[in-house]
Design a protein with these regions (language model features):
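Conserved beta-strand elements of the Class I
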Residues: 206-208, 429
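Helical hinge/lid and interdomain linker segments adjacent to catalytic or ligand-binding clefts
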Residues: 208, 216-317
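C-terminal motif of bacterial Sec signal peptides marking the signal peptidase cleavage site
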Residues: 19-23
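Extracellular ligand-binding/catalytic regions of CAZymes and related secreted enzymes
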Residues: 404, 411-468
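A glycine-rich, often tryptophan-bearing local segment used as a flexible ligand/cofactor-contacting loop or short
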Residues: 270-375
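Catalytic beta-strand/loop cores that center a nucleophilic Ser/Cys/Thr
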Residues: 334-433
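Bacterial N-terminal signal peptides that target proteins for export
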Residues: 2-13
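Beta-rich interaction/scaffold domains
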Residues: 24-206
Length: 468
């Protein structure tokens, strides 16, 4: 009998516990009560009405684009009957970040999130015919698109990416005649911006960024970042693929410089790997050689520095490719604890490539990164020494390759060099240092760009030097 009573008591206790568990939520609101018991029904900040989302328990207050959110006043707060909160009407709150509002009603409570969101009206991306990337100047509110001369600019279809919650006119995906500038207006609440879009058809580009894919938007992030810079900063520049050059679908008759910035996860180590990993460049080598021999210049960075050996720059010796190469994967890029650098070669501090740089402690150093930047350290350099590599000293390297040393690593390796223009052939500038890097997949907290600006300064110097 005693056992039976104990069993009944135990069963009753378990039943009560299960009922309690079923009747309560993580927010201490009984499932037997109305959900409105701890509800924010209305809230305004500085008389700007908040939008209450009951599902996510979020109140979002939309504000003008440049509104000061440091000290906002709760001008209205209406809660469900009998409820109170840790924020009261008339209170001043700092809305630079989201605020938590704790609403209680008797033994019940719910936590809500209060967010101030400035209205934003920006165009982030403007791509024509899914191929040609627009250069956006956010300050001037202009978008510039360069297309090959054969493209019909009277019926181009732009794909436009703009601020969340905004509307854009004309609509994205609708064909437009860009014979004359077209104004795109983005509106989001109190914010509005007008972007003037100019499309220029270029029959004969002045500069070309070359890559292995049909469009620049298909480039890897490192190369795409570099290409985007060129399109925004070098007049009459275009992206072209190696296939375009091989098939001669791009007119290079007025092209002053071809830039190839070649990234490959894990690196490209020497002659044979270059042939294997860049077959598209090998396929176009005859056209590239003709361009070079007719006076065309090259700017070759990272693993693209292998190319001169295949287009006759070093004579018939194909085995003059960089002999000391490595690199990491973009997704696992190394964190820079501080500035990385290489050195200007003795006697070359006055070279045009090194002018106007952001200077550091060492006047002979070329600093290119800052703390908090992630870098793949993709390197294609020449080891110098009698131990291995075929170049006993710098003079031996210059004698065999015909190159001129511009920059060296800490161990004396050749990391930047040029093949000067001669006999009607174009000049070539090469940078194989792992410090020359355009893309960081993320930036650590507190990152401030200082020395990384030197990457774009060096690049602009290279274009100015090669097109003079």
């Amino acid at each position: 009998m005693k056992t039976r009573i104990n069993n009944i008591i135990s069963a009753s206790f378990i039943f009560l516990v299960m009922m309690c568990m079923a009747a309560c939520t993580d927010d201490n609101v009984s499932g037997l009560q109305l959900s409105g018991d701890c509800t924010i029904e209305a809230l305004t900040l500085d008389d700007y009405e908040g939008k209450v989302d009951f599902n996510s328990r979020t109140v979002t207050v939309n504000l003008p684009e440049s509104y000061d959110t440091m000290a906002m006043t709760v001008t209205e707060l209406r809660l469900s009957e009998g409820a109170s909160a840790n924020v009261q009407k008339g209170q001043t709150v700092n809305m630079e970040g989201a605020q938590n509002i704790h609403v209680t009603n008797g033994d019940l409570f719910l936590d809500w999130k209060l967010v101030a969101k400035r209205d934003e009206a920006k165009i982030y991306s403007f791509i024509v015919n899914e191929v040609y990337n627009g250069i956006i100047d956010q300050s001037a509110k202009t978008i510039t698109v360069y297309v090959p001369g054969g493209v019909d600019i009277t019926a181009l279809v732009p794909s436009v990416e703009f601020s969340e919650g905004a509307v854009c006119q004309p609509l994205s995906g609708v064909a437009q005649d860009f014979t004359n500038p077209v104004v795109y207006t983005v509106t989001n609440g109190t914010a509005q911006a007008q972007y003037t879009v100019n499309v220029f058809a270029i029959d004969k580009p002045r500069a070309v960024f070359v890559g292995n894919v049909p469009t620049m938007n298909e480039l890897d992030p490192e190369a795409k970042e570099a290409c985007s810079w060129m399109l925004a900063n070098v007049e009459k520049s275009l992206y072209a693929s190696f296939a375009d050059i091989q098939m001669e679908t791009v007119d290079l008759s007025e092209c002053k410089v071809i830039w190839w910035h070649f990234h490959y996860d894990g690196g490209v180590d020497g002659h044979d790997q270059f042939v294997t990993k860049a077959p598209y460049a090998i396929d176009a080598k005859n056209q590239l050689r003709t361009y070079y021999e007719n006076g065309g210049a090259f700017f070759l960075t990272r693993y693209a520095t292998n190319l001169p050996s295949f287009i006759g720059v070093t004579g018939d010796d194909e085995w003059t490719t960089p002999n000391n190469c490595w690199g990491q994967n973009e997704a696992d890029a190394e964190l820079c604890g501080g500035p990385w650098d290489f050195k200007m070669y003795a006697g070359q501090t006055g070279h045009p490539l090194w002018q106007g740089l952001v200077a550091g402690d060492d006047p002979n150093a070329v600093y290119t990164t800052d703390a908090g930047y992630h870098i793949t350290n993709s390197t294609a350099q020449y080891h110098i020494g009698t131990d291995w590599g075929g170049y006993d000293n710098h003079a031996a390297w210059e004698a065999r390759t015909g190159g001129k040393i511009l920059g060296v690593g800490g161990d004396g390796s050749v990391v930047a060099w040029e093949y000067p223009a001669h006999d009607g052939k174009g000049g070539i500038v090469c940078i194989g240092s792992g410090c020359y890097d355009w893309y960081s997949y993320t930036f650590e907290a507190g990152y401030t760009e200082k020395f990384h600006k030197n990457v774009s300064i060096i690049t602009q110097n290279a274009f100015n030097y090669l097109t003079k």
